């Protein structure tokens, strides 16, 4: 079914709103390469009515953003519309000259792009950038533009808007930058707003605030929204109609709830199954996790019987890591002589059971990543200690530190940033083996092949470089490297937050499988409670540097004690939509 037919069937035929605001018919978009035109969007049709929110959902490379950018003639590189029609308020934009788009962009069609740091000029004050948009669209200039810019920032939910006008983008948090882009996107009161992954890089609580505010503004102004996202749960919660895209084509379209509860296409079913925001509700997620924990503990038990655990530090304990009274205070300098103390972590205590996963959950700035760095021995605590297998990490000598590095390995958020772009995949995975003088050259190569096989990558990727791999493949390489020295514990710091939901699901499944097979212990850092149900046994909820709740995963999801935990649960996109078991 095309998106157009799905939408039409759901609208009353006699309504005065029957005339669509945006109607795309059989859109074709291609990119020119050395070998000719490469199709990116194939025969896409969709309809958006005035005041309606329609979401296009799909993984990276599905063509969803390309479709959106074709509407306003902002296709990157060699992209061009090669067929079909884009009717906006009766005008065919597929045939329109550039001068028509200059008049349309901002005034009639607004855009909120994905990455606010890349889309705000770092050398211009935020106020100037909003004023520039107002002037370009003929709304206001001079003092009037400044007054209006402050009103728009306030409207977008920023407190003390007038003083914010004089700040630069780097002085804003991610959520504040996104609000500034919303202010720019809605500054000319457009009829249609294209929101391209507007919250994918933000914490779930900030995401909810931003989307709630966007909903409120667009409802008040009567603006139609075309929402681009990879998260089916978020799309179903925010949009009336969904369009599911895969490989440049629309594979399913229709009313949001209907698609979510009764998906027909195999790809849509895969998206519904993969989205952590939806899987977090399912009892099956908890049952699968219990099974993995049981397998991992069996492996740990066998290793203990054979004396393979705790060799370097002495006898193994049930708790592989015990943190007591962890506190970290940073000095914030003001000029040459003045400084103030900032407490990032405040008296945090917890234990991680061997063969299990403990998740630390909290918003940005809660202190969770600082705790992870102290557990890894990368940051010295101001007070308190981290004990690994009965030994204080801060007191390790050089030999013990090397042993600790082998036994505890990290996986970080951005796989591209943590892989050397000049190293081949083979050299990347082999490096820890070479550094720790493990095996001969031939043995190391065999080990790399085995590691790549464990993370479901073909041996052929060994000679490739990070820029030749997708985000999910790069994260698999990072996992292979972390496992090279056969660690007992892996610290995953936002290891899936930068990935599409399908790739997220694949990586979470891989981490679970590896834990069951190797008896690994995980400390999993995340801002998103949705992924916790699939990966964790115990949960620590952090806020403002302190632990506000400690419980098992089931207790957190079924009977949270703290208001802050309930707030995080409520912020899970699509969490209110019932899917059954």
Where are these regions (language model features)?
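ABC transporter nucleotide-binding domains
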Residues: 1-281, 293-581
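Post-kinase regulatory C-tail/linker adjacent to protein kinase catalytic domains
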Residues: 287-293
């Amino acid at each position: 079914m095309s998106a157009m037919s799905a939408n039409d069937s759901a609208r009353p035929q006699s309504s005065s709103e029957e005339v669509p605001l945006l109607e795309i018919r059989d859109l074709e978009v291609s990119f020119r390469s050395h070998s000719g035109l490469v199709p990116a969007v194939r025969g896409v049709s969709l309809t958006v009515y005035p005041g309606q929110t329609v979401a296009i959902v799909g993984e990276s490379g599905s063509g969803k953003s390309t479709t959106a950018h074709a509407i306003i003639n902002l296709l990157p590189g060699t992209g061009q519309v090669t067929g079909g029609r884009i009717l906006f308020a009766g005008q065919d934009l597929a045939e329109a000259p550039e001068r028509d788009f200059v008049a349309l962009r901002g005034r009639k069609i607004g855009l909120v792009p994905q990455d606010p740091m890349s889309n705000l000029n770092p050398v211009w004050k935020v106020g100037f950038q909003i004023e520039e948009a107002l002037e370009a669209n003929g709304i206001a200039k001079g003092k009037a533009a400044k007054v209006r810019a402050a009103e728009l920032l306030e409207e977008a939910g920023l407190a003390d808007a007038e003083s914010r006008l004089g700040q630069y983008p780097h002085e804003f948090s991610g959520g504040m930058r996104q609000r500034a882009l919303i202010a720019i996107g809605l500054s000319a009161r457009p009829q249609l707003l294209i929101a391209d992954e507007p919250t994918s890089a933000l914490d779930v609580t900030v995401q909810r605030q931003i989307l709630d505010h966007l909903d409120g503004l667009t409802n008040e102004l009567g603006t139609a929204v075309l929402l681009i996202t990879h998260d089916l749960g978020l799309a179903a919660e925010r949009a009336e109609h969904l369009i599911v895209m895969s490989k440049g084509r629309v594979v399913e379209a229709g009313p949001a709830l209907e698609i979510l509860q009764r998906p027909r296409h195999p790809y849509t079913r895969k998206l519904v199954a993969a989205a952590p925001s939806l899987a977090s509700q399912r009892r099956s997620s908890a049952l699968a996790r219990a099974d993995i924990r049981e397998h991992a503990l069996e492996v740990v038990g066998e290793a203990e019987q054979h004396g393979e655990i705790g060799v370097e530090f002495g006898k193994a304990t049930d708790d592989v890591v015990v943190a007591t009274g962890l506190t970290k205070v940073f000095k914030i300098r003001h000029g040459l002589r003045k400084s103030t103390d900032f407490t990032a972590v405040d008296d945090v205590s917890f234990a991680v059971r061997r063969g299990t996963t403990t998740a630390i959950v909290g918003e940005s700035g809660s202190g969770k990543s600082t705790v992870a760095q102290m557990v890894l021995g990368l940051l010295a605590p101001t007070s308190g200690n981290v004990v690994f297998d009965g030994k204080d990490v801060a007191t390790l000598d050089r030999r013990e530190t090397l042993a600790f590095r082998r036994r505890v390995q990290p996986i970080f958020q951005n796989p591209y940033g943590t892989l050397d772009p000049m190293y081949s995949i083979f050299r990347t995975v082999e490096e820890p083996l070479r550094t720790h003088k493990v095996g001969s050259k031939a043995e190391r190569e065999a080990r790399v092949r085995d590691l790549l096989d464990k993370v479901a990558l073909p041996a052929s990727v060994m000679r490739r470089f990070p820029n030749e791999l997708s985000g999910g493949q790069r994260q698999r390489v990072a996992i292979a490297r972390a496992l090279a020295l056969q660690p007992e514990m892996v610290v995953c710091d936002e290891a899936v937050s930068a990935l599409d939901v399908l790739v997220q699901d694949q990586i979470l499944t891989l981490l679970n499988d590896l834990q069951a097979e190797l008896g690994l212990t995980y400390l999993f850092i995340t801002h998103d409670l949705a992924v916790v149900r699939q990966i964790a046994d115990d949960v620590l909820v952090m806020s403002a540097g302190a632990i506000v709740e400690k419980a098992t995963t089931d207790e957190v999801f079924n009977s949270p004690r703290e208001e802050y935990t309930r707030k995080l649960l409520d912020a899970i996109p699509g969490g209110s939509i019932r899917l059954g078991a």
